[in-house]
Structures are given as C-alpha cells and as structure tokens.
Amino acid sequence: MQTGHKEKKIIPVLFEEMDGIWLHMQDSSHKRMKKQEMKVFTMYEGWDKDQQRRSTLVGKTMLAGMESSRLFHEKREALIEKKYDVDEIQQRILNGDGGSWIKETYDPDAIFQLDRYHVYQEILRKINDRSAQREARNLFEEGKTEELLEFLLVYADSVETTDEKDNRSRNARELYRYLNNNKAGLLPYRKQGKKIPEPREGIVYKNMGVQESQNCTVITMRMKHRRMRWSVKGASNMAKVLCS
C-alpha cells in the first residue's frame, strides 16, 4: 500500500455516493413529528478485481447523520482527509440523485453522475404509458441525452389536455425538469469525456450505484421497520453505530 504524509493512503480515484433516507420522527415526549431526512454517504476506492462476481467494494467507509447539509459535508470531508492524502487524489467521482444538498460538494472538479436507479424510478413514476416508458429508458441507456429531453417534451405536448385531473403532461414536464437540471450527470462517469486515472493493482472500476443497497442493508432494515420512530439525537447515534 502506498502512503503519503502522516501515513495517509494514496489513491488515484475516490468514488463517493450519497442519498437520503426519510425516517419517522418523534419529540422528547414521544409525540409523532414530521419525517426527516437522514443523509447517508459511502466512499470507496473501486471494486476487488478478484471478487468481481460479488462486486466487493475496496476501502468502503460510510457516514450517516441528521445534521444540516453544511455540517454533514464538513464531517464527510474530515472523514476523507483522515483516511486519504487528498492532495494525491487525482479524480473524485460523485453519484447521487441530484438533490441540492448532495451537489453541495467541496470539490468543483469532481465528476457528477446522476444515480441510474433514481432515473429509472422517476421514469416509472412520471410516465404511465409503457411504450413511452420504454422509449425513455432506451434513450437514457443509449446515452442520447438531447433526444431523451426532446422526447419528453414531445410526449408532454401529445398528452396535454384541459382535464385538470389528467396529470400526464404535468408529470412528464416534471421528469424533463429533473433530468435537464442534472443534464451534466446523465451520462455514466466513464462516458463524460474525462480521462480516469488507472486503478491500483487488484482494483477494477465498474458502474456506480451502490448507495441504495448500502442504505437497505446498513440503515433501512434497522431503522425503518416495525413502526419505529426516532428522535434526532437517537437517529444520529444509531447511524453512527451502524456505520462504524
């Protein structure tokens, strides 16, 4: 293993993924409160070359909490700096759903990729017509960004009606805005035209999108079932234990 100053690990690429999990909350008297979002972060160096069938992450580290986005990102950066020589990281790659707090990164040179799972999920939510769903998915998978956005506008126009209860056009335009606002991240990180440094020995680079499964196995199964409700402090403390 290569190390830099203060024995921090030297890596060429750092993969980062972030997502939010909405939890049922309660106050100090156990009275039900509005749901609040727990922020979850996973970083890793790549995938184990010898465990490709299992897609084992190398150097996986997680962080989760109920803090404000500013404080959460400060903790995230501190976690990265504690483990790695950040001056030697040549490329950071961020995968997320496009939420405003997720894109508040400290590194303007990081590559942003819109999470594929969330794109597919939004297509299914916003478009009911199966043939239109299929066309949107195909255009997305083929990396035809402009054609996808144009298709959504044409589809929205084609189903527009004066019936206020018919929300097909409105939903399609919402999907268009979501994708257009995250246009720079619609292509996978390896197809965005930036040269990615070669992986270290024993590591391979694959498609990102591990956060949903990490959420499920680490947080969701422990904190969202059996009608659980949490205080902010309790949720943060439990997240710290689960991510340790």
Pin down the residues of each PLM region.
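Catalytic center-proximal scaffold of phosphoryl-transfer enzymes
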Residues: 1-244
